[in-house]
Amino acid sequence: MCKASVFVGTSLDGFIARANGDLDFLATGGGEPHGYDEFMATVDALVIGRKTFETVLTFDSWPHGEKPVFVLSTHALAPTPPGAIVERMSGAPADIVAQLAARGIRHIYVDGGITVQRFLQAGLIHRLIITRVPVLIGGGIPLFGAVERDIPLKHVATRQYASGLVRSEYVVAA
């Protein structure tokens, strides 16, 4: 079995990026750790959307180290940085999870607005870790779109940081 988790930052009004994809409002962590490294130590691979992949390519350095990154796209991908392990995949979320489980991958980090929404709708997300940045941006790309049914969550923990960030963790209730 392959479980899927989300670790994401949002504005207080629920946006993961500005309408143009800019993430500038997320960089207010003040250099303190917010659990990302600990989370990454628990995952075997990442599953991200093409737009998220293209955004990550603009960063100063590749943030995923030697973790395999599976990019969901039906189009060819932009060239990847040296040392990055990147593979293009497409298909239904359940099929993708099954393919990754068959490769021995037990825990994936799902990232990207549409990708998170698709995996949630398919009932494949087990855990959500959401860090809220204390800023209202008024519009942009929402973390959650319309849902076809309620998705009950159970609150596990919340932590407030000196920088003002608030991280909450939820598990998806059965």
What are these regions (language model features)?
Residues 1-174:
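Enzymes that bind and transform nitrogen-containing heteroaromatic metabolites
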